[in-house]
């Protein structure tokens, strides 16, 4: 089966999605990953990565498409916001360029749920089902953990999550 995995984070970053991706590959699935440039958890590029590249690479037989993103570095909430949304912005261009006709789209969203936007777009483009592995339930986690009280912001987040969870 041809599967597109979308995750802001992927190898060499150390997250659970790596285990799933490599396991699916071992089971004979054709896997491609759309991800960001590795920078988690410190918020700065890993060795051998930069804004310039690599943009495409192969890791253990898996084609990896790397989207640029704004690094969060040691900045506060604004830098984190820019990091999340820049991955969605640059990831959108990557999806538009993808040629493979995927049968499934799998979205890994430890946080934020914004990566789900790319999954919705990819599933529509490839006319296939998408699956979402979410860790934080938005918008509730934004209100409680994020301390956001603005009705306007929470309303926008609520509309975005309804689109993604659908």
What are these regions (language model features)?
Residues 4, 32-34, 65, 106, ...:
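Hydrophobic/aromatic beta-strand patches that form the interior of the parallel beta-sheet core
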Residues 114, 121-126, 152-166:
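Membrane-proximal helix-turn-helix segments that form the acceptor-binding/catalytic region
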Residues 14, 81-92, 104-128, 132-135, ...:
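An aromatic- and histidine-rich active-site surface loop
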Residues 75-79, 142-147:
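Short acidic, glycine/proline-rich loop/turn micro-motifs
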């Amino acid at each position: 089966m041809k599967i597109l995995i979308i995750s802001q984070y992927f190898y060499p970053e150390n997250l659970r999605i790596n285990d799933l991706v490599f396991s699916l590959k071992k089971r004979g699935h054709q896997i491609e990953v759309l991800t960001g440039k590795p920078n988690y958890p410190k918020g700065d590029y890993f060795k051998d990565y930069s804004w310039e590249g690599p943009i495409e690479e192969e890791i253990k037989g898996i084609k990896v498409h790397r989207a640029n993103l704004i690094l969060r570095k040691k900045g506060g909430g604004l830098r984190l916001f820019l990091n999340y949304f820049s991955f969605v912005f640059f990831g959108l261009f990557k999806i538009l360029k993808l040629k493979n006709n995927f049968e499934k789209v799998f979205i890994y969203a430890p946080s934020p749920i914004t990566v789900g936007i790319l999954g919705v777009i990819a599933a529509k483009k490839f006319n296939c089902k998408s699956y979402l592995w979410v860790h934080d339930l938005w918008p509730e986690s934004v209100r409680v953990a994020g301390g956001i009280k603005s009705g306007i912001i929470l309303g926008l987040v609520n509309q975005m999550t309804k689109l993604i969870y659908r």
